């Protein structure tokens, strides 16, 4: 008499050693928080090997090593990648972005150098840049801020004027449609109102930060990690600290010159094909600088970035 076949139990999902898919939503050192693609609880992951090449926003494959930990075994193809860099090293920190949102304010006085660098990063990575001028209710400082931003408006950059604290509903109405469905990196100096803006757009941001901080074992007061917040209308907001460390040392000179939109129509008109646009005769960029078509501050930024890039060994 034949025995009835034994019924096999259902196969459990994502057990230890089995691969699963997810997205990196926070990073601190070599510690990463991954949100599983199937909607399960987030887990702390570490990269396989000594070198850490993972960025917030990466789509990854991971293998669980315990109920709440895993190891990242593969990184999906990236659309783009942003770096934080100085002359000694470059560290990737955000990937798969659509937009770059820079928060400025009427006061304190914002750094035009940092604004310029952020815009160059956006152009070099084909991200849509959005400039926010916050605290427009500080009326005494508003005319000067507008005057400083006028050259950027003339270059075609969006500048949104709002007051996150004074008129939060208006701020949300301006920003929400622009962020919906897109992955946006948020940058801003201290004092510009970036944290207030995050809390406006992501109501549970503080709770999420505490949860991620605890999961990273980085201390309850630690907020110096890049993190991704899903948005209610789709898309995501990536908040990264340390705007001052934002560098462009990894860009080649060719990518750098094309990241200035006012340079691009002129590049083919320089006398020399390998023109550096610094002191060469017959340079179309220098001619445009001399007759006022290119702002001196923009060319000075270009020259500074070329100098910085020349100081490192590639």
Swiss-Prot record:
Per UniProt, where does GTP bind?
134-137, 188-196
Q: Where does Zn(2+) bind?
A: 270, 275, 277, 283
Q: Where is this region: Disordered?
A: 1-20
Compartments it resides in: Cytoplasm
The reply to whether rRNA-binding figures as a keyword in the UniProt entry is: yes
- A Pfam family (short name) is RsgA_GTPase
rRNA-binding as UniProt keyword: yes
Q: Kindly list the GO molecular function terms attached to this UniProt entry.
A: GTP binding; GTPase activity; metal ion binding; rRNA binding
Q: What is its EC number?
A: 3.6.1.-
> One biological process GO term for this chain?
ribosomal small subunit biogenesis
What CDD domains does the record point to?
A: S1_YloQ_GTPase, YjeQ_EngC
| Residues covered by the CP-type G domain | 85-246
Cofactors demanded by this protein: Zn(2+)
PROSITE patterns, sorted: ENGC_GTPASE (PS50936), G_CP (PS51721)
UniProt keywords, alphabetically: Cytoplasm, GTP-binding, Hydrolase, Metal-binding, Nucleotide-binding, Ribosome biogenesis, RNA-binding, rRNA-binding, Zinc
Q: What is its main location?
A: cytoplasm
| Assembly with partners or alone | Monomer. Associates with 30S ribosomal subunit, binds 16S rRNA.
User: Which family is this sequence assigned to?
Assistant: Belongs to the TRAFAC class YlqF/YawG GTPase family. RsgA subfamily.
Primary role = One of several proteins that assist in the late maturation steps of the functional core of the 30S ribosomal subunit. Helps release RbfA from mature subunits. May play a role in the assembly of ribosomal proteins into the subunit. Circularly permuted GTPase that catalyzes slow GTP hydrolysis, GTPase activity is stimulated by the 30S ribosomal subunit.
Protein name listed in UniProt: Small ribosomal subunit biogenesis GTPase RsgA
């Amino acid at each position: 008499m034949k025995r009835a076949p034994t019924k096999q139990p259902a196969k459990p999902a994502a057990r230890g050693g089995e691969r699963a898919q997810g997205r990196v939503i926070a990073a601190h050192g070599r510690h990463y928080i991954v949100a599983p693609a199937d909607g399960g609880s987030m887990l702390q992951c570490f990269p396989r090997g000594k070198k850490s090449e993972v960025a917030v926003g990466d789509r990854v494959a991971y293998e669980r090593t315990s109920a709440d930990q895993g190891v990242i075994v593969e990184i999906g193809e990236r659309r783009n990648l942003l770096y934080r860099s100085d002359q000694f090293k470059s560290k990737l920190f955000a990937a798969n972005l659509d937009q770059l949102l820079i928060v400025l304010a009427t006061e304190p006085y914002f750094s035009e150098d940092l604004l310029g660098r952020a815009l160059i990063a956006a152009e070099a990575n084909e991200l849509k840049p959005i400039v926010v001028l916050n605290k427009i209710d500080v009326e005494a400082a508003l005319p000067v801020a507008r005057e400083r931003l006028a050259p950027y408006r003339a270059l075609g950059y969006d500048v949104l004027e709002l007051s996150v604290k004074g008129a939060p509903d208006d701020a949300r109405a301006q920003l929400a449609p622009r962020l919906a469905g897109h992955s946006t990196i948020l940058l801003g100096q201290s004092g510009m109102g970036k944290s207030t803006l995050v809390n406006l757009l992501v109501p549970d941001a503080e709770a999420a930060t505490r949860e991620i901080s605890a999961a990273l074992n980085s201390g309850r007061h630690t907020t110096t990690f890049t993190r991704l917040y899903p948005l209610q209308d789709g898309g995501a907001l990536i908040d990264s600290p340390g705007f001052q460390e934002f560098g462009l040392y990894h860009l080649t000179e060719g990518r750098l010159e094309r990241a200035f939109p006012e340079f691009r129509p002129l590049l083919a008109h320089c006398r020399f094909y390998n023109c550096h646009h610094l002191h060469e005769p017959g340079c179309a960029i220098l001619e445009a600088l001399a007759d006022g078509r290119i702002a001196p501050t923009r060319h000075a930024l270009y020259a500074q970035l070329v100098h910085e890039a020349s100081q490192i060994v590639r």
